[in-house]
């Protein structure tokens, strides 16, 4: 079964195609490319041995001219130097503005490819082909692109929408257990932020997801893409309601920055950040109930995700990174916090002492 979601935003419209086997030549009719197009597949040295030849051969079978650029794997490579490597290859081969970039990989590859597409000759087309659960449900949708900096995550970037997102659920079968569970953190975030019924479904179906049950995966990924689409079409450029999707990210990005974008995966950092947001909401009072907080904690634990930050990181270590967060203004920390499961709110100028106490006393 193939499912389609259309994302209509001010800068255009594009499909999210979800199904099994989309990298195979039999499904090329679903792709937003045609005979004679020139595509450059951007991938990494971990994904390339598994999927590059399959996609390359599918394109060639359809007379699509294909080149490739293979980058090193890892969040630490989401950098200006890797961006420059992509741009240098495109320029050295005289690729013009009709070239289409194809991001074959997880969130790092998607963000790098999208950013390269946004700046190369002032903008060319690109396609997202997410191969990780996290990228399939979140990073590949919505047009956010960019790279990290020593001073913070995603501090250099742009908005540039893909012309399509091709979600091949077969790719999930080759993920490590850690990579798969990392994606579950963003799925749980969606449920806590936006959809209490979906949270109930996750409580009842998490074991099926962990077993890679096809029907459960299809529903889960499709629902997350629906939720992301519903927010993006209202706030394409992240000026308002889209910030609710950053639930847990202010804390999580602090963890990633502190650790130099290594040791912890993005999903692991977001899971811990989600619990810190829950703890902060409890410390402020009048927001999320203790009962809901426990449900969130238990679901994260069942997914084998962290519910607190790294031991070597002290509460005060978070603050310097949180102040640099894109939601913060004039040195004041603004946070997305849960009011209940399925409802969130942006809180302005949250007291630093409350944040420190919430991180220190996160074990609810």
Swiss-Prot record:
GO molecular function, one term: 3-dehydroquinate synthase activity
InterPro entries: Dehydroquinate_synthase, DHQ_synth_AroB, DHQ_synth_fam, DHQS/DOIS_N, DHQS_C
Pfam families linked to this entry: DHQ_synthase (PF01761), DHQS_C (PF24621)
Recorded catalytic activity of this chain's protein: 7-phospho-2-dehydro-3-deoxy-D-arabino-heptonate = 3-dehydroquinate + phosphate
Pathway annotation: Metabolic intermediate biosynthesis; chorismate biosynthesis; chorismate from D-erythrose 4-phosphate and phosphoenolpyruvate: step 2/7
Localization per Swiss-Prot or TrEMBL: Cytoplasm
A GO BP entry: amino acid biosynthetic process
Residues given in the record as Zn(2+) binding sites: 186, 249, 266
GO annotations of cellular component type: cytoplasm
Broad class of where this protein is predominantly found: cytoplasm
Cofactor: NAD(+); Co(2+); Zn(2+)
Binding site for NAD(+): 73-78, 107-111, 131-132, 144, 153, 171-174
Free-text remark on how the cofactor is bound: Binds 1 divalent metal cation per subunit. Can use either Co(2+) or Zn(2+).
Record carries keyword Ligase: no
The enzyme's E.C. designation: 4.2.3.4
Family per record: Belongs to the sugar phosphate cyclases superfamily. Dehydroquinate synthase family.
Reported function: Catalyzes the conversion of 3-deoxy-D-arabino-heptulosonate 7-phosphate (DAHP) to dehydroquinate (DHQ).
Protein name: 3-dehydroquinate synthase
Encoding gene (name): aroB
């Amino acid at each position: 079964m193939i499912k389609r979601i259309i994302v209509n935003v001010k800068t255009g419209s594009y499909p999210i195609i979800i199904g099994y086997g989309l990298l195979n030549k039999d499904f090329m009719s679903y792709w937003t490319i045609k005979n004679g197009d020139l595509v450059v597949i951007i991938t990494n040295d971990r994904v390339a041995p598994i999927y590059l030849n399959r996609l390359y051969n599918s394109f060639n079978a359809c007379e699509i001219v294909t080149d490739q650029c293979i980058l090193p794997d890892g969040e630490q490579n989401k950098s200006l130097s890797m961006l420059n490597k992509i741009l240098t290859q495109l320029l050295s081969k005289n690729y013009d503005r009709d070239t289409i970039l194809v991001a074959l990989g997880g969130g790092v590859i998607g963000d790098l490819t999208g950013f390269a597409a946004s700046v190369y000759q002032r903008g060319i087309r690109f396609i997202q082909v997410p191969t990780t659960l996290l990228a399939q449900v979140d990073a590949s949708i919505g047009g956010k692109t960019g790279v990290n900096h020593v001073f913070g995550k995603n501090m250099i970037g742009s908005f540039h929408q893909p012309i399509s997102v091709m979600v091949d659920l077969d790719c999930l079968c080759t993920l490590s257990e850690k990579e798969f569970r990392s994606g579950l953190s963003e799925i749980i975030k969606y449920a806590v932020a936006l959809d209490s019924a979906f949270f109930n479904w996750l409580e009842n179906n998490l074991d099926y997801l962990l077993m890679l049950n096809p029907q459960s995966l299809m529903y889960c990924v499709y629902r997350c893409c629906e939720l992301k689409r519903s927010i993006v079409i209202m706030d394409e450029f992240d000026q308002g309601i889209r910030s609710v999707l950053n639930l847990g990210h202010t804390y999580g990005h602090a963890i990633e920055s502190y650790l130099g974008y290594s040791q912890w995966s993005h999903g692991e950092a977001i899971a811990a950040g989600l619990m810190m947001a829950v703890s902060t909401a409890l410390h402020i009072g009048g927001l999320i109930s203790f009962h809901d907080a426990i449900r969130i904690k238990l679901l994260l634990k069942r997914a084998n995700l962290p519910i607190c930050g790294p031991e070597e990181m002290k509460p005060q270590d978070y603050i310097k990174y949180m102040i640099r967060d894109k939601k913060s203004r004039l040195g004041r920390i603004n946070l997305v916090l849960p009011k209940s499961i399925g409802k969130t709110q942006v809180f302005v100028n949250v007291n630093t002492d409350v944040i420190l106490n919430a991180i220190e006393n996160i074990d609810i």
